Structure formats: C-alpha cells, structure tokens
Amino acid sequence: MTTDTLLSVKNLAITFSTSKGPVHAVRGVSFDLGRERLGIVGESGSGKSQTGRAILGLTAANGKITADQMQFHDLDLRNLSKRDWRKVRGARISMIMQDPKYSLNPVMTIGDQIIEAYREHHKVNSQEAKRRALDMLAAVKIRDPERVFNSYPHEVSGGMGQRVMIAMMLIPDPEILIADEPTSALDVTVQLQVMAILDDLVRERGMALVFISHDLHLVSSFCDRVLVMYQGHVVEEIRASELDQAKHPYTQGLLNCLPKMDGNHAELPVLTREASWAEA
C-alpha cells in the first residue's frame, strides 16, 4: 500500500481543564500517515482515543489542543472554521466509535441514517441515495440489505450494528478512517469477522486507517505500523510484523502480559512502570 503522506501531526498536545487542575492527556505526539493501516495501542488513559478525536476536531470543550503541525493535504487542521470542518468530517475523514448503540439514532431506521450520511456530502436524489446505501450494506457482508435497511438499531445484533456503522462511515468515500476500538464490545468470533470486512474495504479503496485499540494481537494482525502510547507519549513506533521484537520495556511488558496458547499456564507477570517513561 502506498505511503504518500496524507496527514502529518507534529508535537500534538492536549490538556484538559478540571476542578483539580490541568490534565495532560496527550504530550508531544508526532506521526505521519500514508495510505496504510496505522495502529495506536496503549492502556486506558494513555491518550490514544484523544489523539484520534483531535484529528477530527472532536476534543471536548474543556480541552486545549496545541501542535506544531496538523496538516491534512493542504488543510491546516489547527485553524479550520466550523464550516470547513463540516466539509472534512465524514466526507474526507471519518470515525467509527466503540459501540453502535451509542452512535446510531434509535428512532431512525438504519437506511434513513445511512442515506442522511451520504446526502450530507453528495447532492443526489433519494432513489440514488437508497441504491448507494443498499450497495454499501452489501459491501459490509450483510446478507439481506433490504431488511436491515428498513430495521431500527435495536433490531440488529451488536456485530450487525457495527457493520452498519462501518457502512455509514465509508459511504461518503473518505480518505482516512479512524476506528476507535470498533470491536471491543463484540465477542471474539464476530470481532474477527468485522475486522476482516474493515480490512478488505480499506485495501480496496486505498484508504488510510488509524486503528485505535488495546488489543496487541489484533493490531499486529491487521496493521502495517504501530504507535505504542503511555501516559500521553508515544514511547515506541514499530512495524506490526516486528512487534514481538519491540525494544521499549513498556511494549515488552504489554506483550509479556498476554496469555500464551502453548499450554504454559504460569501466572502472568504484573506490568511494571517507570516514571521516566512518562517524561520522554
């Protein structure tokens, strides 16, 4: 997959104002993103989701973003107006959230929601929009697109709901897809099915994928490159195929805490942390 740079982030920092003082959620994160699959991994609170949200301008109101650069093609994402953001979000950069129950509108049919997402960025009539929506539902391996099109979110399973979310986010044909733990609420079998669908669509469309996860196995299987985050910092950047050769002790510790499938039932080690890792 070509790695021509689509997005360049330099020295990104995110600080939240709270009643107990400032919280530094992201500190000095830098990376370039081409037409590839980039994984961002780390424990809860490491700053990985906030990094993804900052790319789309979705940081909460009490958060302050600073960066030396956040460049998407010729657009400076640090200085976009609300009007310009509406042209970027969904159309050029999309984001899949963790659980479709909280992302889909419970009082609209699935078809109406996908059509709305498509017509927001494309001036087409209702018949063409419906045709595109049904095609997109078929593309995410839904066997009966017409039935799901006319269903409400509560009438489909978790795995089906996540396929619907993938369809909705991809129908505008964005260049970058940010997937924030898109399978964490699903069982393992459905998880792999959804990831395989997502992987196929990203490859076919020549898109860039930012896959945010705490699951090292999943990231190593589906990504080209990995950023490992700890307390707001990127402590290691490594090719996914070489993850088992990680050099940073934090990444090594995460790998050592994974259960092995070789019959060794020894007690898993406790992950140790050094204060210096958060000062990098």
List each language-model region with its residue ranges:
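Conserved ABC transporter NBD signature motif
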Residues: 64-76
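Conserved structural motif at the start of ABC-family nucleotide-binding domains
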Residues: 7, 24-26
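A short, proline-enriched helix->beta-strand linker immediately N-terminal to the Walker B motif
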Residues: 171-175
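Short catalytic/signature loops enriched in Gly
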Residues: 4-5, 37, 143-147, 237-280
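A short, surface-exposed alpha-helical micro-motif characterized by mixed small hydrophobic
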Residues: 219-221
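Helical segment within the ABC ATPase nucleotide-binding domain
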Residues: 192-205, 217
